[in-house]
Amino acid sequence: TITAGDLTVTAGNIDVVAGTLDVQDGGAITQVTNKGNGVSLSTYSGQITTTNAALAAGVEVTFIVTNTLVAINDVVIVNVQSGGTPGEYMAAVTTVANGSFHITLTNLSGSSASDAVILNFVVIKGAAS
């Protein structure tokens, strides 16, 4: 048990045989006005609620998430938690940069959709060395 400080492994692996890997530095933000507006949330995990502005059938929209904890070599994962009917929306991280990442949200349905979509994300720190 580590109650304070860091754990550094210089060789070998860290294996989670049973249990979960929890990222508990989280936050939440709600987008305003339209689904193309950026948001700012500097946490390693979080929840973004989009506006309920209409998104036409088959259309995608990209918005920026400003996050001071993100670096260019990090991996950011996003998924749709809820909003609309299952399978109606798809979310993907399309760009990662120092201090931000972009999420592209696509309406996969055959009609316009006006849902407040809830997206969950997590940042995994990476390196290029």
Predicted regions and their residues:
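Register-specific beta-strand positions within repetitive beta-rich fiber domains
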Residues: 1-19
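Extracellular receptor-binding modules and their adjoining Ser/Thr/Gly/Asp/Asn-rich linkers
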Residues: 14-74, 81-84, 95-129
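Short linear functional motifs in flexible/disordered or boundary regions
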Residues: 77-78, 88
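Short, surface-exposed beta-strand/strand-loop-strand elements in extracellular ectodomains
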Residues: 87-93
